[in-house]
Amino acid sequence: MNIENAQVQMRKGILEFCILHIISRGEVYASDMLDELTSARIMVVEGTLYPLLTRLKNSGWLDYKWVESSSGPPRKYYVLTDEGKIFLEAMQATWFELADSVQTIIHRSEELSRGGTSKS
């Protein structure tokens, strides 16, 4: 596996978490999600986002409503369900545990590469 494939796999693993976090702030239009992800340097295309949103809705974690737009057709705005909020809280706890574990491993590896000793 080359680095590009590894990066894609890592991003796929956190994309659902990021999407739920963005939606947790309130009603969000899909285009705004794409903009926020892009500004965070997470490149996602509509062909990836919309199937993910459908899967999250089918899981019961989000819902949507149609809102009339003065500049075109109605827009679909996404919002977390109560079940989605609970799921996001659990994902966030898992994220912090995982990030802490990864940081511990990286820190130990750096210590060892500098000639230090590993503390288990």
Regions found by a protein language model. Give the residues of each.
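Short, intrinsically disordered or compositionally biased N-terminal tails of bacterial proteins
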Residues: 1-6
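Positions that flank functional sites
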Residues: 52, 71, 103
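Basic, amphipathic "hinge/linker" alpha-helix immediately C-terminal to the N-terminal HTH DNA-binding motif
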Residues: 70, 74-92
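N-terminal helix-turn-helix DNA-binding core of bacterial DNA-binding proteins
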Residues: 7-48, 54, 67
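Glycine-centered, phosphate/nucleic-acid-interacting loop/turn motifs that mediate DNA/RNA or nucleotide
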Residues: 60
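Amphipathic alpha-helical dimerization/coiled-coil segments
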Residues: 86-120
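Short E/K-rich amphipathic alpha-helical oligomerization segments
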Residues: 63-69
